[in-house]
Regions:
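C-terminal motif of bacterial Sec signal peptides marking the signal peptidase cleavage site
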Residues: 30-33
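Alpha-helical transmembrane segments
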Residues: 25-28
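Bacterial N-terminal signal peptides that target proteins for export
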Residues: 3-22
Length: 279
């Protein structure tokens, strides 16, 4: 009886030790998995946005504006010139970029008129952009790898274009709500692309938003004049050793038909930039 009891106790003890060994092994595996650091081979952000005083980019700008039910498109040329470097309030090197505008058909340097200025701030992990309205974006982020996602608009106010701007510059819509939650994603890395007939290599695509409400598959036409419809689209492309080569932003609403506007009406804007020259 004593031997049998001893054997059962010993067997129980061995089973308990085995269970604890399994638990400890599992915990060790979990901690090992948690402590593992993935490493990515990535280009530097400076390769996709080379910045130095005197650097310039010239773009073809297609601008869309709405007048009641009419969609009006106009075309210009923009020239962005890195004008100077300064320090921001965090003592970070900041590049001031002056933007000029002229008619799309012009080739005269005297036709350029200053439109405004914006700022580019390269940090150790991101490229920050502060635009004409003092809105800040994280335009690029390390590592530059496919499907990396980040909240590039996280610094924006809740309704940047409808509430944060001065009344004379604001839009009476709500489609800008939630822009701070947009997911910037690298949907293309190291690709070939053609913009306005010019071929580029090593192109990075940053998809920012692509959302529609009550639109036909063309994403431009409401399903009915009686429907409230929205369009929010944003994307950028950068070419290695060149910079921004393409940008598109659509932000607009269609309001349903009414006695005063039987076709409904639109509120909002759209822009498209395509690089045509640079140094």
């Amino acid at each position: 009886m004593i031997n049998q009891s001893f054997q059962e106790t010993n067997r129980f003890s061995m089973n308990s030790r085995l269970q604890w060994l399994i638990v400890i092994a599992c915990i060790t595996m979990v901690f090992a998995a948690c402590s593992k650091t993935d490493t990515y081979k990535s280009d530097q952000l400076s390769e996709y946005m080379p910045l130095q005083k005197g650097k310039y980019w010239i773009y073809l700008l297609d601008s869309t504006n709405f007048y009641n039910s009419q969609r009006v498109q106009t075309q210009y040329q923009l020239k962005d010139v890195v004008d100077d470097t300064l320090k921001d309030n965090l003592n970070r090197t900041t590049y001031r970029v002056i933007r000029y505008i002229r008619p799309s058909s012009s080739t005269s340097d005297s036709a350029w008129n200053i439109m405004g200025e914006y700022y580019l701030i390269p940090t150790t992990q991101t490229l920050e952009t502060i635009d004409f309205f003092n809105f800040k974006y994280q335009s690029l982020k390390l590592p530059v790898v496919l499907n990396l996602t980040w909240k590039g608009n996280s610094y924006l106010p809740a309704f940047p274009y409808s509430e944060a701007l001065p009344v004379q510059s604001s839009y009476n819509f709500t489609v800008d709500g939630g822009m701070g939650d947009w997911d910037y994603t690298y949907t293309g890395v190291g690709e070939n692309d053609t913009i306005n007939g010019i071929a580029y290599t090593n192109v990075v695509t940053v998809s920012q938003e692509d959302a529609s409400t009550n639109l036909l598959p063309d994403n431009q036409t409401p399903t009915s004049v009686n429907d409230f419809a929205t369009r929010a689209y944003s994307a950028e492309k950068y070419a290695k050793n060149i910079g921004l080569i393409y940008k598109k932003l659509e932000l607009w609403e269609h309001q349903p038909a009414s006695p005063t506007n039987p076709g409904g009406y639109y509120v909002g804007f759209g822009i498209q930039l395509q690089l045509i020259d640079h140094n």
